[in-house]
Curated annotation (Swiss-Prot):
GO MF assignments: rRNA binding; structural constituent of ribosome
This protein's record includes keyword Phosphoprotein: no
Designated gene of the protein: rplW
The name this protein goes by in its record: Large ribosomal subunit protein uL23
GO BP terms in the entry: translation
Role this protein plays: One of the early assembly proteins it binds 23S rRNA. One of the proteins that surrounds the polypeptide exit tunnel on the outside of the ribosome. Forms the main docking site for trigger factor binding to the ribosome.
Natural source organism: Xanthomonas campestris pv. campestris (strain B100)
Keyword field: Ribonucleoprotein, Ribosomal protein, RNA-binding, rRNA-binding
Amino acid sequence: MSSNEKIFSVLRAPRVSEKTARLQEISNQYVFEVSNEATKADVKAAVEQLFDVKVKAVNVVNVKGKSKSFRNRAGSRGNWRKAYVRLVDGQSIDVTAKA
């Protein structure tokens, strides 16, 4: 697996919401959806390599999927993993840029 494949297998998507926008402004933190097997070291390496920034800290949270029903059938959404990435002061990522 090449390094680009490794990066894109670790980082799935940026999470953009009011809360994440506030975190970006206040504490220079960015939120990404990552693979369930990704470690903090994997996330740090992927962000530093992809966006060419210096990462100060990474916190990872496992999010449990919600129970949902559809036409009287019980089901659930999948579990996923979220990474909070704090950058060194003075650096930023444009997560809204188009590829």
